[in-house]
């Protein structure tokens, strides 16, 4: 926290702490990468739902991508560290489970970077409920273009890729394996 000290005679007087504006808070959070997909930030991923001051305490509401996401604690720690770096020591990170996170909340520019990183971005669901990732028996045929060569000649290898929120695919044209960020 930034504290200004003014000299007024023989005693120093401390000015009240300077509270960062919310735009600075959002900018700091936009610099926090997702631990499992470091090419996009937690803001671009759409998991930071709200930021508000409650007196001198900053409250950050976060909706995890999955309620059991193993990166949740790491994300909370990274949030606190990023905000401490701009002088905010009193931070409450609140996990907000409702409404559930949707891949529709991923920013368009983040989808472009996912593809460049080698992860096929999820289809935009537009509010539809998709159960295709829940059970292989319910899985509808989903065309997942290869993020490397854009071929649609791809096949599902495993419902789970490098993380639970991704499936493993392989391109039949360039023969490269790749992750697909499952929509939900």
Report residues per predicted region.
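Domain-level signature for proteins that mediate thiol-based redox and metal-cofactor handling
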Residues: 1-184
């Amino acid at each position: 926290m930034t504290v200004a000290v003014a000299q007024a005679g023989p005693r120093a007087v401390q000015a009240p702490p300077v509270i960062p504006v919310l735009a600075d808070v959002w900018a700091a959070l936009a610099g926090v990468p997702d631990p499992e997909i470091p090419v996009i930030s937690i803001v671009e991923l759409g998991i930071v739902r709200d930021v508000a001051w409650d007196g001198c305490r900053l409250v950050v509401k976060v909706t995890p991508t999955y309620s059991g996401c193993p990166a949740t604690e790491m994300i909370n720690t990274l949030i606190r560290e990023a905000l401490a770096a701009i002088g905010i020591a009193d931070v409450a990170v609140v996990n907000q489970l409702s409404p559930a996170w949707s891949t529709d909340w991923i920013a368009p520019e983040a989808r472009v970077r996912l593809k460049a990183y080698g992860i096929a971005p999820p289809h935009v669901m537009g509010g539809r409920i998709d159960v295709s990732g829940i059970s292989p028996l319910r899985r509808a045929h989903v065309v997942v273009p290869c993020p490397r060569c854009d071929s649609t000649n791809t096949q599902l290898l495993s419902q789970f890729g490098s993380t639970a929120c991704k499936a493993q695919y392989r391109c039949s044209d360039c023969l490269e394996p790749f992750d697909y960020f499952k929509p939900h």
